[in-house]
């Protein structure tokens, strides 16, 4: 463990406990600013991962995050957000954490060290060769994640290792390695800090770009969001208003006519067509609004 960057002591915070609160905050903030830059070198690899994820997603595959502790929680968080943001089915983007749901709020002793459980959890969701499995581990050596990636390889799923150390163990068992070297943590070994931030940013990129690739975004607007509350319903109407150049009242009326489906509403308006025709256009164009409009 001592050779891992994530376990090393940060020379900028050797006397962290002696700093004033403001001095410590400035130091933490300065370290946090290194995170986005640390992601830049892996963008070409990330591009390849996302291209393949889009292809598999279109073919009925799923995006599956798996990790332990903070890493697992971040995967569960990103997966959960895809449902309201992009109207995905809960089974399309899945977050798995060592120790199960209970591990979201408390530490489960020994869970991350269980190699076989990583395999078992993937078997439980009936992993198949169309799926993409992203193993998340700041240290890059978590047995639970390594077991999951090993099993995923056996059934020909696409495997990706996301870690915050170079030449990590999990990188050796994945088709693609995403290694974000953020340097030693402000608090030695506390990977919920810079490492967690880096993982969150990378997962955001993967899910966002995948959803753009399968047609869930128009320009920079979420045209496939699921309006599960009043705020999101209002946002849906405003999106129609913005794209179609309508008043709020007109957009609201159109939204209702389209059975609360933003995409159908947009195609109906911009193509001056019926709901049925708008649906057909979308089906024939992989659910991509701009292509449906041009068809």
UniProtKB/Swiss-Prot annotation:
<keyword id="KW-0456">Lyase</keyword>
<comment type="pathway">
    <text>Amino-sugar metabolism; N-acetylmuramate degradation.</text>
</comment>
<dbReference type="GO" id="GO:0097367">
    <property type="term" value="F:carbohydrate derivative binding"/>
</dbReference>
<comment type="function">
    <text>Specifically catalyzes the cleavage of the D-lactyl ether substituent of MurNAc 6-phosphate, producing GlcNAc 6-phosphate and D-lactate.</text>
</comment>
<dbReference type="GO" id="GO:0046348">
    <property type="term" value="P:amino sugar catabolic process"/>
</dbReference>
<dbReference type="InterPro" id="IPR005488">
    <property type="entry name" value="Etherase_MurQ"/>
</dbReference>
<feature type="active site">
    <location>
        <position position="112"/>
    </location>
</feature>
<comment type="subunit">
    <text>Homodimer.</text>
</comment>
<dbReference type="GO" id="GO:0009254">
    <property type="term" value="P:peptidoglycan turnover"/>
</dbReference>
<dbReference type="InterPro" id="IPR005486">
    <property type="entry name" value="Glucokinase_regulatory_CS"/>
</dbReference>
<keyword id="KW-0119">Carbohydrate metabolism</keyword>
<dbReference type="GO" id="GO:0016835">
    <property type="term" value="F:carbon-oxygen lyase activity"/>
</dbReference>
<dbReference type="InterPro" id="IPR040190">
    <property type="entry name" value="MURQ/GCKR"/>
</dbReference>
<dbReference type="InterPro" id="IPR046348">
    <property type="entry name" value="SIS_dom_sf"/>
</dbReference>
<dbReference type="GO" id="GO:0016803">
    <property type="term" value="F:ether hydrolase activity"/>
</dbReference>
<comment type="similarity">
    <text>Belongs to the GCKR-like family. MurNAc-6-P etherase subfamily.</text>
</comment>
<dbReference type="Pfam" id="PF22645">
    <property type="entry name" value="GKRP_SIS_N"/>
</dbReference>
<feature type="domain" description="SIS">
    <location>
        <begin position="53"/>
        <end position="216"/>
    </location>
</feature>
<dbReference type="Pfam" id="PF20741">
    <property type="entry name" value="GKRP-like_C"/>
</dbReference>
<protein>
    <recommendedName>
        <fullName>N-acetylmuramic acid 6-phosphate etherase</fullName>
        <ecNumber>4.2.1.126</ecNumber>
    </recommendedName>
</protein>
<dbReference type="InterPro" id="IPR001347">
    <property type="entry name" value="SIS_dom"/>
</dbReference>
<dbReference type="GO" id="GO:0097173">
    <property type="term" value="P:N-acetylmuramic acid catabolic process"/>
</dbReference>
<feature type="active site" description="Proton donor">
    <location>
        <position position="81"/>
    </location>
</feature>
